[in-house]
Amino acid sequence: MLVDNGVIGDSRVQKAARSAADAGWDVVLLGRAPVGQPQSWRLGAAEVRLIPMAEPLSRRRHEFRRAWLRHPLAYPPSGVAAHRTQTVRAWRADLAVRRAALTTAARDAGAGRPGGLPWATLRAEEKLAGLTRRWVGFRNRQLTRARKGRKLDGPWDRAYTAFWRRLRGDGAWRRLEPGLWDYELAYGPVVDELAPDLIHANDFRMLGVGARAKIRAAARGRRIALVWDAHEYLPGVQPWRDNARWLPGNVAHEREYVPYADATTTVSGGLADLLREEHRLAERPAVVLNAPAVDEVPADPTGPVPDIRALCGLGPDAPLLVYSGVAAAKRGLGVLVEALPRLPGAHVALVVNKPTSAYVRGLVTRAEELDVADRLHVLPYVPHHQVVRFLAGAQVGVIPIQHWPNHEIALITKFFEYSHARLPLVVSDVRTMAETVRETGQGEVFRAEDVADFVRAVTAVLADPARYRAAYDRPGLLADWTWEAQARVLDDVYARLLPDAPPRPATPASAPAPTAVPASVEVGA
């Protein structure tokens, strides 16, 4: 099983690896080490290995060159700018201490103001340091302007992209997004050494790694079955890098290697239909929802579940809205903060992946400006087997995501986590989620980014939460929204691709398997 991240924080991948191992498959999950050293641990009966990966190809050649013509005084893009900036800061800090020491010595000696050669020398150095700081700052600004002019989004870059796409077709990714080779060079040799019977490639980057391993194995007379697990509709993704080549490069890479997949799985029916049409797949991808693992027993089942209300300093009756997941502008979290002045007495808990990120700090600052900072609570993730019980302490689950193509076509992880916590929902009007909430009656829908409509929806839910919670009593609703149900779909895909696999002595799913995992994992992306 292949994934392009550090595994921790990716609940879908963790659940897939663990449930496949519980079903009797011999699972090795390869991820990317966040530091330069390899790491390994057990995830239930699955083995996790994190591989160190260098990224020299993620930087383009122009990023190593100086802009001699446009910005001749800019620092070279070698990292020396940060070194010089820090050096000047250290120098000025030292001068401040020397000034304080001379001032104290003069006062203790009864001389009043300091003087003499040491003081004159210090004053001269301070002037020199000030001039140096301005010079370093100027060269830094020149470097920033040079980089801004090299973001690969100008007319020349669009022409370059069009040229290679016309010349090489889907093979153009080798020119447009060469950083994909960094993944191949790190993961490929490890996959070859493992000699798997089946590769489960998560998302678009790992599709190429898996396909190339399959091609090499076929040349040696071995068959590898390849499963592509598509988490997103790539043409609708907001580019992860700030250049015009990233998206067409990755789309071309995906198109080149999709034909090598023996089966495709994905996260929603809408995305399954899109993928079948986009890639002319012979069959509709199997749908494996991002549902929570409600029956999973942790390695330490006695570990206490944090109390979300206690962490917020709230009693049992205070209205508490919760958002759990990634903190980013396209997730629409600003609407929660803007609404707080219009929701007297209500509190908001943001359970996010990076509580101290610049985006989250901006939300806190805005809450302070609105004089509602005491009602905004920022909390870190909890282990994924505690998520549902943790969230159940809130009163309303909020999903305020904005209109992006991938948001329209799937029920995201937090939707299912809120549902199993039996929380009434307030969700934005992205298509699939809004249709589901209206059909089940488990919450209210508001217009994305519309603060007034959000306040209306929250007010309606808080007025009669029992009405919305009653939706979860529908027979079979929550049972279908579990990872245990989804794992059976995945197991059927594996079994179909490997019909000659020996009988699998399944590990009982209810039994905790030895697990040694670094501290915390995601609440839900």
What do the predicted segments below correspond to?
Residues 315-318, 352, 360-386:
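Nucleotide-activated donor-binding/catalytic signature segment of Leloir-type glycosyltransferases, i.e.
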Residues 439-440, 444-451, 459-466:
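Conserved acidic donor-binding segment of nucleotide-sugar-dependent glycosyltransferases
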Residues 375, 391-408, 423:
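Acidic donor-binding loop of glycosyltransferase active sites
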Residues 449, 463-496:
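A charged, aromatic-enriched C-terminal amphipathic alpha-helix characteristic of glycosyltransferases
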Residues 27-178, 270-276, 285:
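N-terminal strand-loop element at the rim of the active site
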Residues 168, 173-177, 185-190, 208, ...:
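Membrane-proximal helix-turn-helix segments that form the acceptor-binding/catalytic region
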Residues 265, 303, 314-340, 349, ...:
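Conserved donor-binding/catalytic core segment of Leloir-type glycosyltransferases
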Residues 28-31, 49-52, 225-226, 235, ...:
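Donor nucleotide-sugar binding/catalytic pocket of nucleotide-sugar-dependent glycosyltransferases
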